[in-house]
Amino acid sequence: MKKFLYTLLALLLIGLLTTYFILFTEWGNKIIASYIEKKINPNERYLSVKTFKLRFNSLDFKAQANDDSTLILKGDFSLLKQSVDLNYHIDIKNLRSFKDLIPYPLRGAIVTSGNIKGHRKALVIQGVSNVAQSHTAYNALLDDFKLSHLSLNAQDANLEDLLYLINRPAYANARVSLQADFNSLKPLEGHLILTANNALINNALINQIFHLNLKDTLVFNLSHSSDFKGNKAISDTTLTSPLVNFTALKSEYLFSILKLNAPYTLEIPHLAKLQNMINHPLKGSLTLKGDIEQSPKLLKVSGHSNLLDGALDFTLLNKDLKGRFSNISTLKALDLFHYPKFFQSIADVNLDYDLISKQGVLKANLKNAKFLKNSFSDFLYSISKFDITKEIYNDVNLVSQINQQRLLSNLSLKSPKTQLKIHNGLLDLNTKQMDMLMDAEILKFVFKMKLQGNMHQPKFSLILNEKAIQQNLQQGLKEILKNDSIKKGLDHLLKDDKLKEKLEKGLKGLF
């Protein structure tokens, strides 16, 4: 019996000594350090333990990654009580290296330091950081080494750095404040609030992404909140500025496929302020409602607006814009674009446009169309004594080929008494110059008409070729012969063979 007890005590002593040598001696600490490295680096060597000193009541630990990221832990450590009071310093050179630990693709550098205190069931972490050049404080509570709560408060963070950190383009620059509370990091669960005042738009990037032409300095205020749950974020975003107001409520971002779906409302109170962006003056206001869908290879924006007494519906798919105007007033459209009010109608318009090449096709069908009194109607009256403003056109078709700022158009209008056609008429919106040839027929009077010069004050000229003159003379004679008195007189003259011969020769000379 004594032999058994001695053996048991010896084994226990050997076990204690072995545990002591492994845990609390330099030789044993090297074994533990090697084990930690193998556990962290199962396939390739990424992190190496530079210092590992574990004693009865203290710990001194330093690990370094291949990119020179470092982790330092130093302070009180009790293995028996399973309690710690450690100070830490973490310097991460690139968050992208931790993609296996964090479900969101973060990037950039971060430095943080603080204190870890407590025991296995209640471990409290308090720290500070300069993430995105901010003044950030955070608190975390771990239960059995699993995150049960994380709160974060960041002030004066640089928005460009923050957007870079979360792998988003630098749409703007500002100083922002951020408050966040999370109950889990994997999966991400919690709530976040972000605000920014007097933020400055990155014109170059916005122009590149949305194919715009921003020139002026644009300042805005931003309010954003997100709820994270089930590998997605549900967000509310409000942006206000002197130029535009934007709201996206209940937008959804799926982390697994990096996809955004956002219903939005866009308000532009004064379209005149867009002149420097689109190089053209506008009037009035605009409200758009629609949806935004964005993923790494897709940008889809759809929208609807009630305007010009009708409706606009459009879809932007990457660089391709398709728009439809339904039952709009052309008179209000001309007023919107500061064009001369020479024509009124109800129009349906379809637009296919490439935002990169700035080329496309515009097709329009007009009904209840009518010319208004202007220099064009005055010119037609001067040559035909016909008031075209009294005509109603229900068969009007327009097709325009768009190339940059130049429109090459085919236009046809038809009424019971008139017919007007333009083939390959040129309108340059940049120079405001036009060059068009119109084929016209008014009360059987056939002629060509040249429209040239400034679109706001064009010049008109009449062109009569030999065929047109013949047609008009023939029609004139037909109208003359409808007069009974003249017809009887001609019948009497034609009884004289000599006069008849002379008249025939004269008519042949005309035709």
Region roles according to the model:
Residues 1-13, 17, 42, 50, ...:
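Extended terminal
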Residues 16-89, 93, 97, 118:
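Terminal hydrophobic membrane-targeting helix
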Residues 45-47, 64-74, 101-114, 130-139, ...:
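Amphipathic hydrophobic-ligand
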Residues 64, 92-96, 107, 117-121, ...:
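Flexible, solvent-exposed coil segments and beta strand-coil junctions
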Residues 78, 117, 143-144, 183, ...:
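Acidic/polar residues at beta-strand termini and the immediately following turn/coil
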Residues 86, 125, 150, 190-192, ...:
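Transmembrane beta-strands of outer-membrane beta-barrel proteins
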Residues 92-94, 131-133, 156-158, 196-200, ...:
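Transmembrane beta-strands of outer-membrane beta-barrel pores
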Residues 362-391, 397-399:
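A glycine-rich beta-turn/hairpin centered on an aromatic-Pro dipeptide
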